[in-house]
Design a protein with these regions (language model features):
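Membrane-core helix-loop-helix motifs of multi-pass transport proteins
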Residues: 136-223, 239, 379, 403-445
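Membrane-interfacial loop-to-helix junctions in multi-pass transporters
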Residues: 4-8, 63-69, 95-109, 140-148, ...
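Transmembrane alpha-helix interface/packing and boundary motifs in multi-pass membrane proteins
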Residues: 17-25, 79, 113-122, 153-159, ...
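Core transmembrane alpha-helical segments of multi-pass membrane transporters/permeases
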Residues: 30, 55-89, 107, 115, ...
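Hydrophobic alpha-helical transmembrane segments of multi-pass integral membrane proteins
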Residues: 71-74, 100-133, 332-376, 380, ...
């Protein structure tokens, strides 16, 4: 099977999964594993890969996401225990006193927490810091969960440009440049991005304010019909432990600090946090078992999606098919447009984020585009900057990014709704950043 045919099969696989997700044909886990299995069967049947090779690709793919899956299970359990114990009730009460019914203030607070939380460059830890803290406030004010995610992913996309962030380091390594040097060059675009992140919070905060004012009491019924609040509805007051509030706050802060310091694997931090939280707040094996079971369904549902996404990534990414997809895409760029390569790839970066995982995008597509750009005298750094800045805007709405599923799982939003709600806005933000880069002289053509 030729490289072009392999690439076309890869595109067909990705498009099939996206269509199944957006049309709500089935749950994400089944979409990932069924389509990936069909593709794997075709690859083995045509002799492109042996059965052993394909098994190895799938194993590597699942291995690459299993940490995120375990992290999700125990993070859901940890924050569930803290919610049962009543810790968030007091925190929410304090926040509500500060902001009252100031919807715009809540949106800005979300942006601030996401920006600070993403200083470590970790998408999972930022979602774990921001969403559990802000989601109860959004529910109390009847703000949409999709808006919470939109504000989060906008701020996170901008902060993901730090030199210790994965995308910047990957791009710098490909063009053989120091990450700090690349970051200094793109910093003006990041500053514009931060302004846009704050603007996003203000704009969508005002939109939520108008929506709530317009619908009035009817909004309660609308939210009840749209969201399943069975996981956080009427809590069992018998599980509340107000006397342990200080301990629970200290434990939560300790978990977050250790996460940011990156001393231990994130999932292990939450395992220990769960153990301490359950043992200190509750007594008896029966109660421990009951609490774990009450939160198991949410954790296992999303963990299964993440693991099945690992199968998808294994079949396409570990096999090298995504790299072949990148080569085919680059071959369609007309020679007459070669010098405009940074602009072209900048405009297309958000849609491409839905097709390529981070490694394939930077290690597969970037080297090919740099080679093409060299033929037209295009500075490799300008191509890298356009790809890093514009692509980051869509990192956390991509169905091939494991952290995306952690975020939507914590917020209780379907992947199709998340993409539909955020895609247009994130694409707009990326184009504004690109235009700013051109105006400020960060990118030349």
């Amino acid at each position: 099977m030729s490289d072009t045919i392999l690439a076309l099969l890869g595109f067909a696989t990705v498009i099939a999964v996206i269509v199944l997700l957006l049309r709500n044909v089935t749950v994400p886990a089944l979409a990932f594993v069924s389509v990936s299995t069909i593709t794997a069967a075709i690859l083995v049947a045509t002799g492109a890969f042996t059965l052993d090779e394909m098994a190895g690709f799938i194993k590597e793919g699942v291995k690459g996401v299993h940490g995120t899956a375990v992290l999700f299970i125990f993070s859901v359990l940890f924050f569930g225990v803290m919610t049962d114990a009543g810790m968030f009730d007091k925190i929410i009460g304090a926040l509500m006193k500060k902001v009252g019914n100031n919807v715009v203030g809540v949106a800005l607070m979300t942006c601030l927490i996401a920006v600070i939380g993403h200083l470590d460059g970790g998408g999972a830890s930022t979602f774990l810091i921001t969403i559990p803290a802000m989601l109860p406030v959004y529910k109390r004010l009847h703000m949409r969960r999709e808006t919470l995610l939109l504000i989060c992913v906008t701020a996170m996309g901008v902060m993901n440009l730090m030199p210790w962030g994965g995308p910047t380091m990957r791009a710098a390594s490909v063009i053989e440049m120091e990450p700090n040097d690349l970051w200094f060059q793109l910093m003006p675009m990041q500053i514009v991005g931060l302004v846009l992140a704050v603007g996003t919070a203000i704009f969508w905060g005002l939109q939520e304010k108008k929506r709530i004012a317009k619908l009035g009491d009817a909004i309660v019924a609308e939210d009840a019909g749209k969201y399943d609040d069975s996981d956080d509805g009427k809590k069992d007051e018998a599980l509340a432990r107000p006397q342990n509030f200080i301990f629970n706050v200290i434990l939560t802060l300790a978990v977050i600090i250790v996460l940011v310091l990156d001393i231990f694997p994130s999932y292990y931090v939450f395992m220990v946090g769960c153990a301490l939280g359950i043992l200190v707040n509750y007594r008896g094996k029966k109660l421990h078992s009951s609490i774990i079971k009450s939160h198991a369904s949410a954790g296992l549902s999303m963990a299964s999606t993440i693991l099945c996404a690992g199968v998808f990534l294994g079949v396409l990414s570990k096999s090298g098919i995504m790299e072949k997809m990148a080569v085919v895409m680059a071959s369609f760029i007309p020679t007459s447009l070669g010098r405009f390569l940074p602009i072209i790839i900048g405009i297309l970066s958000v849609p491409l984020a839905l097709l390529f995982d981070t490694d394939s995008y930077f290690y597969g597509l970037l080297p090919v585009l740099v080679s093409v750009g060299n033929q037209f005298g295009v500075n490799p750094a300008h191509i890298a900057i356009a790809m890093v800045v514009c692509r980051n805007c869509a990192t956390f709405i991509s169905p091939v990014a494991p952290a995306t599923y952690l975020g939507i799982g914590l917020a209780g939003v379907e992947i199709k709704d998340h993409i539909k709600y955020c895609f247009g806005w994130q694409w707009g933000v990326s184009i504004v950043c690109l235009v700013a880069g051109l105006i400020l002289g960060v990118i030349h053509f």
